[in-house]
Each structure stands twice: as structure tokens, then as C-alpha cells.
């Protein structure tokens, strides 16, 4: 089945969630290499290596499902770019599942069947670098999603600043006209003058809010860690 033909619309995801996805996808790189290493150690007689490889595979497979399908915390392939990476020409989902199947074959190979063990292990060793490169591409894709998320947040902040600036300018004009009218009214305009002063104070607070929003959006961001 072509998953791209039934792909879901893009979902807005928070920077916090994308950060967790970056960490999860980054851990997949480490697990893939650890699995191969433990299977090599098992082939040389390490009594605990096979169990470690089996646990690593379980974690790896579960994490892949979380990344692609999603769960109560993660949204799955929430963007067109991720859907294309996993289910398009790059075939990331299929290739990762093939790696999982090959690992399971190597783990389940009978100890007495040394030729089958050696064959399945040779295939995994050959695939160690390509799968690492693929998982690196996946991690980079999530990092790009983080960059897009940050750009969207900054745009919303900029739009908010523009709206507040427009309101502040209009309010300043109203306040200035009100002061002129109060001055012309003489003694009768004193009460109105108090109201214009309150309006001026509100405008001042609004200007401070605008500066705060601008300062927050211009604050330097630390590098995203995988």
C-alpha cells in the first residue's frame, strides 16, 4: 500500500515535541550500531550479548513505531516532508523495517547452524553503515522541522508586534487629540484630562509589551542537540 496516497494533513506540533522526536531519532542511530556490535560479540561467544541485542532491537522497533505511527505523546509523520522521507522514494520506513527483520533473523538463527548465523551477520555488518546514514537523514529531517517551527513562532510574534504597534499608534493619536480638546475646554476639561492620562499610561504599558515581545523573538537560540 502506498502510504503517500492516504497521507494525513499536516499537524501543528510544538517545539518541545519536535525536540523529543529529535532525541528519539538520534537514539535510533546509536541503537542500530549497538545491535550490530552485540551480535558480533555474540558470534564470538559472549554469553550476554544476544540478550542485549534482543533488548536493543525491542527498543529500536518500538521507537520506530512511535516516530512513524505515533502514540499518545507523539504525532507520527506530521508533515509532508516526513511522509515523503518515510514512504516516498527514500523508503526510510521500509528500509528500517528490513533492518529490523534482518536483525531478528540473526538473533533467531540456531546456535548450531554456524553457516546461517555467519550469513545473516555478514548481511547486517554490510548494512551497518547504510542504516546509520539513513537514520542520520531521519534525524536531520526532524531538525529541519524544528527550524520550520521556530520560523513559524517568530512570524506569529512579528505579526503580533505589528498589530500592537498599529493599535498603539492609533491610541497615541486619540490621546493627543484628547489632550488638545481638554486644554481647549479649560476648567471643564480637567476630568477629561485625567482620562487622557490614563489612556497615555495604557499606551506606555503597551509599548513596553511590544519591546518585550521583540526582545524575546530576537533572543539567540541555542543549537538543537540530537
What are the residue ranges of the model-derived segments?
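A conserved signal-transducing helical linker
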Residues: 12-15, 19, 148-168, 223
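N-terminal extracytoplasmic segments of bacterial inner-membrane proteins
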Residues: 16-47, 173
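Amphipathic, well-ordered alpha-helical segments in soluble domains
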Residues: 24, 31-35, 59, 63, ...
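Secondary-structure edge/capping motif, primarily at the C-terminal ends of alpha-helices
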Residues: 32-46, 67, 71-74, 102-117, ...
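Heptad-repeat alpha-helical coiled-coil/4-helix-bundle sensor or tether segments in soluble regions
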Residues: 57-115
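Juxtamembrane amphipathic/coiled-coil helical coupling segments that flank
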Residues: 127-153
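Parallel, heptad-repeat alpha-helical coiled-coil signal-transduction segments
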Residues: 183-223
Amino acid at each position: 500500500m502506498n502510504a503517500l496516497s492516504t497521507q494525513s494533513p499536516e499537524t501543528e506540533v510544538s517545539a518541545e515535541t519536535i525536540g523529543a522526536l529529535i532525541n528519539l531519532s538520534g537514539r535510533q542511530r546509536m541503537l542500530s550500531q549497538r545491535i550490530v556490535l552485540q551480535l558480533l560479540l555474540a558470534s564470538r561467544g559472549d554469553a550476554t550479548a544476544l540478550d542485549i541485542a534482543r533488548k536493543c532491537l525491542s527498543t529500536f522497533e518500538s521507537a520506530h513505531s512511535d516516530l512513524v505511527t505515533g502514540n499518545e505523546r507523539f504525532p507520527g509523520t506530521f508533515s509532508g516532508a516526513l511522509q515523503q522521507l518515510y514512504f516516498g522514494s527514500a523508503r526510510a520506513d521500509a528500509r528500517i523495517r528490513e533492518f529490523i527483520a534482518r536483525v531478528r533473523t540473526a538473533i533467531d538463527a540456531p546456535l548450531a547452524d554456524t553457516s546461517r548465523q555467519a550469513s545473516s551477520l555478514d548481511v547486517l555488518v554490510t548494512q551497518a553503515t547504510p542504516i546509520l546514514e539513513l537514520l542520520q537523514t531521519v534525524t536531520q529531517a526532524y531538525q529541519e522541522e524544528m527550524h520550520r517551527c521556530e520560523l513559524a513562532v517568530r512570524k506569529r510574534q512579528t505579526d503580533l508586534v505589528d498589530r500592537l504597534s498599529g493599535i498603539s499608534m492609533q491610541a497615541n493619536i486619540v490621546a493627543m487629540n484628547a489632550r488638545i480638546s481638554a486644554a481647549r475646554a479649560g476648567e471643564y476639561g480637567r476630568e477629561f484630562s485625567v482620562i487622557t492620562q490614563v489612556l497615555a499610561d495604557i499606551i506606555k504599558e503597551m509599548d513596553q509589551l511590544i519591546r518585550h515581545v521583540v526582545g524575546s523573538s530576537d533572543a539567540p537560540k541555542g543549537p538543537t542537540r540530537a
